[in-house]
């Protein structure tokens, strides 16, 4: 595979006399003069790209270098996007938190979950609060209940030093409700039953 992270010598930038050439479909063409390889590339409307300069002789390949770079850059962009989506975000709560702060922080957690992130929810204990872990568990339970429509805890809460942590993970998108389609299927049945009902005889 060609490494897009580094610059490659392309076409006339290749100054060696002979190369080992690989075709556009990955086939081995063999060792040929560079000028012949350049002529072959021009004939096919492709570029001659040096992919292994340390080999003896250097290895080159026929390809559309502009298109190749574009596709690789798009792939790298998509990979970075997926990596960001898998990033674990962190939101911290105090044991003594008022409703306003709680709602604000759970709103941040919700936004991260909607974006596809995992979220580490941390309860920070201070002083003697550490002797009452049930207070932290109560807040984490409240967080999980508040966000149950979009996320769920991954495992049980765990203590680390003066902090209690819980990981929230996004729920899968719900499947589309089939109720509408079922009712749509029932309607023709009702109409067909109505249509098949015998008409009352006309009054004489």
Curated annotation (Swiss-Prot):
GO terms for molecular function: ribosome binding; translation initiation factor activity. It is found in: Cytoplasm. IF-3 binds to the 30S ribosomal subunit and shifts the equilibrium between 70S ribosomes and their 50S and 30S subunits in favor of the free subunits, thus enhancing the availability of 30S subunits on which protein synthesis initiation begins. Belongs to the IF-3 family. It comes from Deinococcus geothermalis (strain DSM 11300 / CIP 105573 / AG-3a). One of its GO terms (cellular component) is cytosol. Pfam families: IF3_C (PF00707), IF3_N (PF05198). PROSITE patterns: IF3 (PS00938). InterPro entries: T_IF-3_C_sf (IPR036788), T_IF-3_N_sf (IPR036787), Translation_initiation_fac3_CS (IPR019813), Translation_initiation_fac_3 (IPR001288), Translation_initiation_fac_3_C (IPR019815), Translation_initiation_fac_3_N (IPR019814). SUPFAM superfamilies: Translation initiation factor IF3, C-terminal domain (SSF55200), Translation initiation factor IF3, N-terminal domain (SSF54364). Keywords: Cytoplasm, Initiation factor, Protein biosynthesis. The keyword Iron-sulfur does not apply. GO terms for biological process: ribosome disassembly. This is Translation initiation factor IF-3. Monomer. Residues 169-204 are annotated as: Disordered. HAMAP family: IF_3. It comes from the Bacteria.
């Amino acid at each position: 595979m060609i490494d897009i992270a580094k610059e490659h010598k392309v076409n006339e930038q290749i100054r060696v006399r002979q190369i080992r050439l690989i075709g556009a479909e990955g086939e081995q063409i063999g060792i040929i003069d560079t000028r012949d390889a350049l002529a072959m590339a021009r004939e096919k409307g492709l570029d001659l790209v040096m992919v292994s300069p340390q080999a003896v002789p250097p290895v080159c390949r026929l390809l559309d270098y502009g298109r190749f770079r574009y596709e690789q850059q798009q792939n790298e962009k998509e990979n970075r996007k997926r990596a960001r989506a898998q990033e674990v975000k962190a939101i911290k709560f105090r044991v003594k938190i008022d409703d306003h702060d709680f709602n604000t922080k759970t709103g941040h957690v919700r936004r991260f979950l909607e974006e596809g992130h995992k979220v580490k929810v941390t309860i920070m204990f201070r002083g003697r609060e550490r002797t009452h872990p049930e207070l932290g568990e109560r807040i984490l339970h409240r967080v999980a209940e508040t966000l149950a429509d979009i996320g769920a805890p991954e495992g049980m809460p765990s203590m680390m030093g003066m902090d209690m942590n819980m990981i929230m993970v996004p729920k899968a998108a719900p499947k589309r409700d089939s109720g509408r389609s079922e009712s749509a299927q029932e309607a023709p049945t009702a109409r067909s039953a109505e249509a098949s009902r015998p008409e009352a005889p006309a009054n004489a």
